[in-house]
Amino acid sequence: MNQRSVICSATARFVPREASTTIPGIFRSHKPRGIQGIEFGNSGPRKYSSDRFICITSVNHHRFRIRLYKSGEEMKAMVIARQSSSPGLALVDVAPAELGDKQVRVAVRAASVNRADLAQLAGTHTSIGGVPQAQVVGLDAAGEIVEVGPGVTDYARGDRVMAMVAGGLAQEIVVDASMLIPIPTNWSYIEGAAAVLGFMTAHNALVTTARMADGESVAIHAATSGVGMQAVQLARYFGAGLIVGTTRSDRGSALLDALGVDEVINTSSTDFAARALDITEGSGIDIVLDHVGGSYLSMNIQAAAVKGRIVGVGRLGGAEGLLDMEALAFKRLELVGVTFRTRTTQEKAEIVHALRRDIAPFRPDAAHRDIHESLRPVIARVLPWNEAEQAYQLMSGNDMLGKIVLEVG
């Protein structure tokens, strides 16, 4: 098809959006310069550049989807306005990322709030590659694929996906296809955003690092945190024989009871190590997932079984603790920390692959996408993304039980 042979008038605000038409062809722009688009010919979509036109990008039942896209076009993103101990955010226009090989562009519908975001705002959360000057916040996102790059075979436009991604709090993201997880059919975008990072973290800690076997006992500190609750769910899903969850409040105890935790320990009034040894008749806990750190290290070593595994996931209670080297050696314990910050893109993709391998609805080729209700994330609050600062303040207050999710408009 000649790109100028079928022309119809169209008004366009040159911001990321989609429209539909029953007429195939090229749309005349009211902007004179720098339009980029896709020409839809018999051989399929192909890129072209023009100074006057935009074009359809896909066709379905004689309805054509167009993408209004201008060279240098801007989108909205939430960026760090200042780095300090309190959140400083601004919703600004930024240039969208270029789409590369084996990547997809996702129109973001929701992104969750994570504790690592608070460190990011404070300027203390760095990773491989450093921190860009105008940093877009957010570590995850859920949305719809709107563009597919060369070499992507498992996904198509219109697929609903979730991903761990730097800068997720934006109208669009570009992400490697290897980092994508399909959203189960019985989940919303909000649930996808709430789940993806927590499940990646919990699965990597519990299944990959601690090598949990069927029937083993698992203790999860700060079990009412986002990662903690999803670790509880995965421990049950993968056949833990005993699940112990710790919290410091009666509200937290009630929530953990509802999640099916076998033994809830309120550490504000009960000694964790003593109680863990009591309920295991002295044998101890096989796997301890620790989100607290600090003084909990010595309790974990006391509570651990011979050949137990202690996995440090977070340091809410501090980065330093007392280590009993004699007990560590006597029990032949494994003590290991996990983080995403020093992992390469390939290493993160391997974590995604392991999660998709072990939970069938997360596979791109899954015949059935409904996921078991026991794995549904707990959501405490949903806010519009222009209230991101309020969301971070709510998280800082430590009063929310469940994930806080921002809907992206």
Regions found by a protein language model. Give the residues of each.
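Short helix-loop-beta connector
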Residues: 186-188, 211-217, 282-283
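Mid-domain Rossmann-like dinucleotide-binding core that forms the NAD(H)/NADP(H) cofactor-binding site
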Residues: 193-269
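Rossmann-fold dehydrogenase core element
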Residues: 306-313, 323-375
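A glycine-/small-residue-rich N-terminal strand-loop-strand element
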Residues: 142-165
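Glycine-rich cofactor phosphate-binding loops and adjacent beta1-alpha1 units
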Residues: 257-336
